[in-house]
């Protein structure tokens, strides 16, 4: 933070202006709750991934194919990173995640994005789970993302996530 302030001061000095700042808010980093994650992982394994149909796979392939070459290259790289190069063609042919990826407390992936859940996590136990609701490698903030959120794929993902969250809440209270 202090480096950013120094950069702003330097810019003001270079332009013959002045600067001041007021720290009105800050966001705390995300604090994973491993105990809740272990409960949710067991519930996710029990509920299972959404059950996709051939029509779902066809629709997902259409969305995947609609990305430009640069995005498709990034998606291929992401698939290789998650599933391994030996499964690339399999995943591309059926580009909906049909697996529950087991929780590994030594391998917590925090993806980019903006959220205030870090602040919440310091006040109350917080859990973040991920369920497929769009094609593998989907690119956020695109028309493809918007369209997929209104599709049967997203509806199945939503229902599956709801079951996982409900079962996790029940198991947490038991």
Segments (PLM) and residue ranges:
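Metal-dependent amide/peptide-bond hydrolase catalytic core
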Residues: 1-174
